[in-house]
Regions:
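Asp-box/BNR beta-propeller blade signature and adjacent active/binding-site loops
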Residues: 1-238
């Protein structure tokens, strides 16, 4: 995954301002060990650190205008980095950018994004960064959390909202959308791969008709590489 040395050493709590203004910051680490922070609501920008976050380079504009769609996705097979950018607060047209030089420069690229099993196109907004699967028959797959907005982020529409994921088996050219997360009213999610290849999915839920605390989150898992989700659980600790 890249050199560990920049990230080793004595643990310390350090507060460092990487960017000013706007929202939706996110951080990934590239295959070369570079830390890349992204953010933005008027245009999407990035800053790079090659020393584990001690110092940061100048701002790099990924898209202007642009609205940050969660974090980046690092392809651990090729080293390419993918950025999903919407034109404004979603639902909004989606643009995709790719970096082939460790986040130093970005180019807009065309992709094919397929709808989910309900025929709905996903939004990427307010979800965490994507990952590359490392285990099992789907090793090398790119996957990142996504969501369906049902028209807009309106409280009356929350019962129709749901999270899901998008994934690619051809290095980011074509993306399929997973089946919905098994609970409506969800959004703002993250996922991680476990050592046995199971994908753990954790999502906020704005709408909780059964009376559960809407401030807590819900979890599910996938054993088919992120195509379907099962074992829905109300999280008691997050």
């Amino acid at each position: 995954e890249g050199p560990l040395e920049p990230h080793l050493g004595k643990s310390a709590l350090e507060i460092q301002q990487v960017f000013k203004g706007e929202r939706f910051g996110n951080i990934v680490v590239t295959m070369k060990g570079t830390v890349v922070a992204t953010w933005g609501t008027s245009h999407v920008r990035a800053c790079r650190s090659e020393d584990g976050g001690k110092t940061w380079g100048k701002e790099i504009v990924i898209a202007k205008p642009g609205f940050q769609c969660g974090g980046l996705t690092v392809d651990e097979t090729t080293g390419n980095i993918w950025a999903f950018v919407e034109e404004r607060h979603p639902p909004a047209p989606l643009h995709v950018y790719r970096s082939k030089d460790d986040g130093k420069s970005w180019q807009e690229v065309s992709i094919k994004l397929h709808p989910d099993s309900k025929g709905n196109m996903p939004s990427m907004h307010m979800n965490e960064h994507g990952i590359t699967l490392r285990h099992g028959k789907h090793k090398g797959r790119l996957i990142r959390p996504a969501r369906f907005y049902a028209g807009k982020n309106d409280r009356s529409l929350w019962p129709k909202h749901y999270t899901n994921a998008i994934y690619s088996d051809d290095g980011g050219t074509t993306w399929k959308t997973s089946d919905p997360f098994p609970a409506n009213g969800t959004g703002e999610a993250t996922l991680a791969e476990l050592s046995d290849g199971t994908i753990y999915y954790n999502s906020r839920r704005h709408w909780a008709p059964e009376g559960k605390n809407p401030r807590r989150r819900w979890t599910a898992t996938s054993t088919d590489g992120g195509h379907t989700w099962k074992d829905l659980v109300f999280c008691e600790v997050l």
